[in-house]
C-alpha cells in the first residue's frame, strides 16, 4: 500500500547512517508488510496492540507498562483516532521514547477540521475524526513535530492514496488522488546527561 511505502521511505531517510541493530523500536498495530522487514533490522523490536493477539505484547497506548526512555523509534500508524484519550496516548509515547528518539504517528485525514465525538462513532469506531489540525496537539507533548507530506516527493514514487468513492477528504489532490501525511515527533536530547 502507498502509505506503507511512504512510511518505509521516510523511516529510511530519518535513520540514514544509524546502525539499526543498536536501536529499539516499538511498533503499535504493526502492519505485516513493515513488521517482516523491520523486525530483523532492529536490535530490539517489540510489536504491540490492545486487542490483537499476534503481537509481542498486548498494550494500551494510554497506559504502557514500559520504563521511561525505553525506545529509540515508535511507530503508531492509524491508531490514535481510536484511542479514548489520545492525549494520554501521546503523553505515554513521549514518556517511553528515549531522548533524541522519534515517533511516527499518522492518522487519517477525515475532515477539514478535527471533530471530537462524545462517544466512538458506531460505524467507524473513531473517538476523534481527524483533520489537518489534529497534529497541533502533538506539539504539547514533543519538542519537535514535523509533518512530512507525500507531495514533497517525486510523483513517480506514487506516495499518494487513491480513493474510489467521492468523499470530500481534505487532502484531495485530483480525482481519486489524495495526499498523505506523516507527522514525525521528536523528543529532545537530555541536555543534563554526560
Show where each model-derived region lies.
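An acidic- and aromatic-residue-enriched active-site/binding cleft used to recognize and process polar
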Residues: 50, 76, 108-110
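Conserved N-terminal segment of class I S-adenosyl-L-methionine
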Residues: 1-65, 178-194
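A short acidic, Gly/Pro-enriched loop at the edge of an enzyme's catalytic core
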Residues: 61-74, 91
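A short SAM/SAH-binding and catalytic strip from SAM-dependent methyltransferases
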Residues: 72-84
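S-adenosyl-L-methionine-dependent methyltransferase catalytic module, highlighting the catalytic core
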Residues: 84-94, 98, 102-194
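Short intrinsically disordered, low-complexity coil segments enriched in acidic
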Residues: 1-7, 77, 95-98
Amino acid at each position: 500500500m502507498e502509505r506503507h511505502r511512504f512510511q518505509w521511505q521516510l523511516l529510511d531517510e530519518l535513520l540514514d547512517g544509524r546502525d539499526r541493530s543498536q536501536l529499539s523500536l516499538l511498533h503499535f498495530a504493526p502492519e505485516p508488510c513493515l513488521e517482516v522487514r523491520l523486525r530483523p533490522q532492529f536490535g530490539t523490536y517489540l510489536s504491540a496492540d490492545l486487542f490483537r493477539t499476534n503481537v509481542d505484547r498486548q498494550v494500551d497506548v494510554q497506559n504502557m507498562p514500559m520504563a521511561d526512555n525505553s525506545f529509540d523509534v515508535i511507530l503508531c500508524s492509524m491508531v490514535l483516532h481510536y484511542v479514548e484519550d489520545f492525549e494520554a496516548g501521546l503523553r505515554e509515547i513521549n514518556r517511553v521514547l528515549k531522548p533524541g528518539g522519534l515517533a511516527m504517528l499518522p492518522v487519517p485525514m477525515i475532515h477539514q477540521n478535527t471533530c471530537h465525538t462524545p462517544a466512538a462513532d458506531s460505524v467507524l469506531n473513531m473517538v476523534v475524526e481527524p483533520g489537518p489540525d489534529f497534529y497541533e496537539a502533538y506539539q504539547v507533548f514533543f519538542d519537535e513535530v514535523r509533518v512530512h507530506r507525500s507531495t514533497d516527493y517525486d510523483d513517480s514514487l506514487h506516495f499518494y492514496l487513491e480513493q474510489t468513492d467521492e468523499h470530500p477528504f481534505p487532502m484531495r489532490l485530483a480525482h481519486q488522488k489524495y495526499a498523505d501525511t506523516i507527522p514525525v515527533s521528536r523528543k529532545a536530547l537530555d541536555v543534563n546527561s554526560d
